[in-house]
């Protein structure tokens, strides 16, 4: 087999594996979230369908796929129809440049668990994952429903504001490492526990986590939907499989965000002591992913004015100060 044919086959297999694994993980994440929230609320959670309620996932999938797909008569039908697809596609495309695990050898060839190892991977991931919100915005506007439009507008204001917070936090990381490559950022932290960037950039870590909650529409910083204020927000008019596509895209973005935090701040897939790198990657990413559930269970939903004041009066000034301190440290 020629090198090009092997490369093409390898890339195709990687794409199929990523889509299959992360679509499945999105379903498992819903089960995990329900169990975690039940524990916080002193309930049991799903436990009737299958052992430990695991088959509840299949039941939910059947229910979702067999629901009637309704398109409102006064909506912008084409945009309304494709918006959920944009959400899922952008979420999966952003995973293409994220290195998942350490490289390994298969059939005498070195395999890198990444679809495209590009030297501007960080820009690519942030850019494509940011496009996911266009699906939310377009879906809300195309629905021609006042709650959907309000949810889309609130989310647009938040995402524009908090993208600045996340970008300023990441610039500090790039200044230290000197590269936009996620592989280079991972390798920068390969000298042991205290080489992790969370110790050199603790403020950037906090700022990026907060921006990530806005990016993934998670409580307590989610402005696109609120049962007490705007019902389901942008998704009020969606049902069936189209709603499921939004759902899969959101959870895939959450998983990608957890992996990205691990790569940027927590040592990536570098091994620790006798623990292999791939185990460390899974454990650390799972821990970050758990924070989504913990925050939803522990904190109340913030009002839009509180979210925006926190951004412009606290977070952006802190991000700028952190950037200036990092620049001085690099120069000196």
Curated annotation (Swiss-Prot):
GO BP annotations, alphabetical order: aerobic respiration
One GO MF term, please? quinone binding
Q: Give the membrane topology, semicolon-separated if more than one.
A: Multi-pass membrane protein
Q: In its keyword annotation, does this UniProt entry include Cell inner membrane?
A: yes
Its annotated compartments are: Cell inner membrane
**GO cellular component term of the entry, any:** plasma membrane
Q: Which domain of life is it from?
A: Bacteria
Query: Which of UniProt's keywords are assigned here?
Result: Cell inner membrane, Cell membrane, Membrane, NAD, Quinone, Translocase, Transmembrane, Transmembrane helix, Ubiquinone
Q: Which reaction does it catalyse?
A: a quinone + NADH + 5 H(+)(in) = a quinol + NAD(+) + 4 H(+)(out)
* UniProt feature coiled coil, ranges: none
Q: Which EC number(s) are documented for this chain?
A: 7.1.1.-
Q: Which family does it belong to?
A: Belongs to the complex I subunit 1 family.
Tell me the function of this protein: NDH-1 shuttles electrons from NADH, via FMN and iron-sulfur (Fe-S) centers, to quinones in the respiratory chain. The immediate electron acceptor for the enzyme in this species is believed to be ubiquinone. Couples the redox reaction to proton translocation (for every two electrons transferred, four hydrogen ions are translocated across the cytoplasmic membrane), and thus conserves the redox energy in a proton gradient. This subunit may bind ubiquinone.
Q: How does it assemble?
A: NDH-1 is composed of 14 different subunits. Subunits NuoA, H, J, K, L, M, N constitute the membrane sector of the complex.
This chain's protein is named: NADH-quinone oxidoreductase subunit H
